């Protein structure tokens, strides 16, 4: 059974345009309700969270209508980070968790992510079954069994307490000035509150969401503003989250950015030294830098490569019994603490290292020399298949041959946007850039 709607992180697209329409959300809610309510002898419930996008309310209402029409009870959260849904779904004994978010994408986009009763994202197979149900005639509940919907007003505060509980109780953040950029997204209340309650001097940015400014010139994909603020106020460190707060990048006191690879390198070494790194293995995607792989090898730590997408990182972690993984983009997954990437928890663990060791962010955050890497994206029309074009395949083959023995090449279709991503790594930057430019040119000609 194959998936067409679902990508690497649920369903995503431009709001009010297929597939992110109220009609599709309604059918998805009904299909998911039907799937999880197959045993009608017990009450069933679903938790729904959302970020701060204007379209989130439309999609939330459509999902709620679909779910309740099949007899599911719906628990509605205020805007919360994605990991809060992963936490609260099992806590509230729900069959299903839903997060309405397009993560780091612009406000015009939105998405739907599905979580199982254990708080982990649903497998490809379950998503495929739900998608198949969407195309079928879905039986509705009798009038007396229609589900109910209610708001859960303390969900965000339950999440805040959980995040704080991951910070060592013997440590405090007193004397530490922290810039936190919440991307005008889901963590705009939680992140400053957590840091303040733990004692930090908090300089908050991106905490004025208006429904249209999420990720706009801020957050983990645009850390320049936070870097400037750090230099302006003399902060010790910066934490930049994305729109749903499941990814993070850090900024040291000089304004230099540390991506997910650098963050994972620090945690992997510390945990390995302490005997906490299960299997002495880090799970990361094929996008992670070769420099990370070399650093881990020097520390006798195994790098387990996965497909792109934090869900595939988590699947590999669960299959192998590992407890640390993530992506270069900033998804940091620590299954000792959470079921999915949690930017705020990852940021707190970094602050704990600063306090525990007395070392600066710049000392802790840059553990290896990155191999030069270039990544370029080419947008294409939905439904097109530029990678199938003979000229593109020839350019890829030529690039692979030129980089043989001196670098690596990765070309893939994004699972969340209509983009072809062309990435190369090599010590010879001129060669690497030329290879990428040739392939990008061929893809652009094909679209």
From Swiss-Prot:
The modification Phosphoserine is found at residue 103. Activated by phosphorylation. Keywords: Isomerase, Magnesium, Metal-binding, Phosphoprotein. PROSITE patterns: PGM_PMM (PS00710). One of its GO terms (molecular function) is phosphoglucosamine mutase activity. The active site is at residue 103. The keyword Phosphoprotein applies. Binds 1 Mg(2+) ion per subunit. It is an enzyme of class 5 (isomerase). Mg(2+) binds at residues 103, 242, 244, 246. Catalyzes the conversion of glucosamine-6-phosphate to glucosamine-1-phosphate. This is Phosphoglucosamine mutase. It comes from Jannaschia sp. (strain CCS1).
């Amino acid at each position: 059974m194959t998936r067409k709607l679902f990508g690497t992180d649920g369903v995503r697209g431009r709001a009010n345009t297929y597939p992110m329409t109220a009609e599709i959300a309604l059918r998805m809610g009904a299909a998911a309700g039907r799937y999880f309510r197959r045993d009608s002898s017990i009450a069933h419930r679903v938790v729904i969270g959302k970020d701060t996008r204007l379209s989130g309310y439309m999609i939330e209402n459509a999902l709620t209508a679909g779910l309740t029409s099949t007899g599911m009870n719906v628990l509605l959260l205020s805007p919360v980070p994605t990991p809060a849904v992963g936490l609260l779904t099992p806590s509230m004994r729900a069959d299903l968790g839903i997060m309405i978010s397009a993560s780091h994408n612009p406000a015009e986009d939105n998405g739907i992510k599905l979580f199982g009763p254990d708080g982990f994202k649903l497998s490809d197979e379950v998503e495929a079954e739900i998608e198949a149900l969407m195309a079928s005639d879905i039986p509705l509940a009798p009038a007396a069994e229609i589900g109910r919907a209610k708001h859960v007003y303390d969900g965000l505060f339950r999440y805040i307490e959980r995040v704080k509980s991951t910070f060592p109780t013997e440590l405090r953040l007193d004397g530490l000035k922290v810039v936190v950029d919440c991307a005008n997204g889901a963590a705009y209340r939680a992140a400053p509150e957590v840091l303040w309650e733990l004692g930090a001097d908090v300089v908050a940015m991106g905490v004025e969401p208006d429904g249209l400014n999420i990720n706009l010139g801020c957050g983990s994909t645009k850390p320049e503003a936070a870097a400037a603020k750090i230099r302006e106020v003399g902060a010790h460190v910066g934490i930049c989250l994305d729109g749903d707060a499941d990814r993070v990048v850090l900024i040291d006191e000089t304004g230099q950015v540390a991506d997910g690879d650098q963050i994972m390198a620090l945690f992997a070494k510390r945990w390995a030294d302490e005997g906490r790194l299960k299997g002495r293995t880090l799970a990361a995607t094929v996008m992670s830098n070769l420099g990370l792989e070399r650093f881990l090898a020097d520390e006798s730590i195994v790098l387990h490569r996965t497909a792109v997408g934090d869900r595939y990182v988590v699947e590999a972690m669960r299959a192998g019994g590992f407890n640390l993984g993530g992506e270069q983009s900033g998804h940091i997954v620590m299954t000792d603490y959470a079921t999915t990437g949690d930017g705020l928890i990852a940021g707190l663990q970094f602050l704990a290292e600063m306090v525990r060791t007395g070392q600066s962010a710049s000392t802790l955050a840059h553990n290896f020399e990155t191999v030069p890497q270039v990544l370029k994206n080419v947008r294409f029309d939905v439904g097109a298949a530029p990678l199938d074009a003979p000229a593109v395949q020839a350019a890829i083959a030529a690039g692979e041959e030129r980089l043989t023995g001196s670098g690596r090449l990765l070309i893939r279709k994004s699972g969340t946007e209509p983009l072809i991503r062309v990435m190369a790594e090599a010590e010879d930057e001129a060669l690497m850039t030329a290879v990428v430019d040739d392939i990008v040119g061929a893809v652009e000609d094909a679209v």
